Amino acid sequence: MMGITDIETDGTVVGMDVSKLELVGFADREQEQFSCPNSSGAIRRLGKRLAKLEPKLVVFEASGGYEGLAVSIFTEIGLPTAVVYPKRVRQFAAGLGVMAKTDAIDARMIAYYARVAKIQPIPPHSGEL
């Protein structure tokens, strides 16, 4: 059984909650909340800002494809990204007694879930078949 001392604490994990119109994020080590419109230019600016944090992982909750643009852009600029199932994040949050559901809370829970579950980034595309 994993104990609290087994949870890695090195590097920042960023949780991203995505909707059609907006991305809401949370950087766990910095305890920083942020948001931006779900548009190419805004996502690129956010990606550059996040790159300065040198995150070990940026995690998106699957949201019917609304996360696709951000995942693509973040991967392109070299940020380690992953996508997780919403049901698992909700079960994790419920296990912690967090029943409220807002974009800000979701982003925080995504980051915490990714750290505890040791989610790994999507492998970079090599360009080879």
PLM regions and their residue ranges:
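Phosphate- and other anionic-substrate recognition elements at nucleic-acid/protein interfaces
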Residues: 1-129
